[in-house]
Amino acid sequence: MEMKNVKGTKDYLPEEQVLRNKIKRACEDTFERYGCKSLETPTLNMYELMSYKYGGGDEILKEIYTLRDQGKRELALRYDLTIPFAKVVAMNPNIRLPFKRYEIGKVFRDGPIKQGRFREFIQCDVDIVGVESVMAEAELMSMAFELFRTLNLEVTIQYNNRKLLNGILESINIPTERTSDVILSLDKIEKIGIDGVRKDVLERGISEEMADTICNTVLSCLKLSIDDFKDAFNTPLVAEGVNELQQLQQYLIALGINENAIFNPFLARGLTMYTGTVYEIFLKDGSITSSIGSGGRYDNIIGAFRGDNMNYPTVGISFGLDVIYTALSQKETISSTADIFIIPIGTELQCLQIAQQLRSTTSLKVELELTGRKLKRALNYANKENIPYVLIIGEEELSTETAMLRNMKEGSEVKVPLSSLSNYL
């Protein structure tokens, strides 16, 4: 049998997991600093849930992994963490609002594969339910900037409002049933340009006259500020979208993050579930062209799941761990899983005890040479594993209750007392 992974999946070896775990911890620490609570949901879901009309829309339906259990039930692997979160809130009406949750977990999409994007990947999500104010969006955007500062990545956030976009399309008489098609085309404008948008809407069955109107409208809007849209498109939906964008902009200025937050009137976020603010996060240096995070407001899903069709104001943000890992691995040296490596020279029993003592009395990550390698080979292993310190303990060192501490980066050695070893690290 040929040993190979399923296309779009990957094994991450221990040296890769060091960096991936660092990203996870940075996410967890940042999310919890903002008062978010951890939640875990099943990977396996009912197909009816994952294909619900208020979820990802037709584009996502094509990418859902489906299966059937022995009871002939139609099931699906989750394609995001948002729909399972909405399900949890709908099933638990006693959850105290506002509820701020985070979840880090695997999701699956049978879609195209490219740099930093696979078919099995990890999302790191935060969602807030129970807050109508765009202050929630501002806090999530601020949290995103803080997370990427922690990871030493410079980012920009593009943002828009679906009410504004829908209002513009309404004002140029795009039929309601064609709005989703046009939005999906507009969402690609930065990748395919205005000519590409025209071609795309034509392929979706839009008439040439309507396609020309769409493209002319896009060109006329590109230089407009947020405030200008009220005068350019005098509709209630545009006015509502502009008001929310103006409020959001005020919060971004107050938080000192407006400079790296860019208004993009045709950012759409293709998913049909969004009802207000939408945003996407990009690396400033452009080393990865796809977004490394995204999200927005979706006020209708929970009410639809509960069957009461009430408005449950909800906004979320999602970070792609795999694409962040790809970005960091291009610029960061992989560190070690251990702080110190103990090499016994005829002192295995005592070194076993010393390693255990260090683990229980300090925060050091300690690895012990277990295979009986000679000193040179053991040092070579520590060097390849990027372990910063090595502790060499032989009979002579034991007799004086000392050890030889080697700094692997500098190549220097010093004899240190075992009783105060942590002071030298």
Curated annotation (Swiss-Prot):
Under the heading InterPro entries, the entry gives:
aa-tRNA-synth_II, aa-tRNA-synth_II/BPL/LPL, Anticodon-bd, Anticodon-bd_dom_sf, His-tRNA-ligase, HisRS-like_core, HisRS/HisZ
A single Pfam family, by name?
tRNA-synt_His
**Enzyme class label:** ligase
Q: Which GO terms describe its molecular function?
A: ATP binding; catalytic activity, acting on a protein; histidine-tRNA ligase activity; transferase activity
Question: Would you say which domain of life the source belongs to?
Answer: Bacteria
A GO cellular-component term linked to this record: cytoplasm
Q: Which gene encodes it?
A: hisS1
Does Acetylation count among this protein's keywords? no
Swiss-Prot/TrEMBL GO biological process terms: histidyl-tRNA aminoacylation
Report which reactions are catalysed by this protein: tRNA(His) + L-histidine + ATP = L-histidyl-tRNA(His) + AMP + diphosphate + H(+)
UniProt-listed Gene3D superfamilies:
Anticodon-binding domain, Bira Bifunctional Protein, Domain 2
Main site of residence? cytoplasm
Please identify the protein, giving its name as recorded: Histidine--tRNA ligase 1
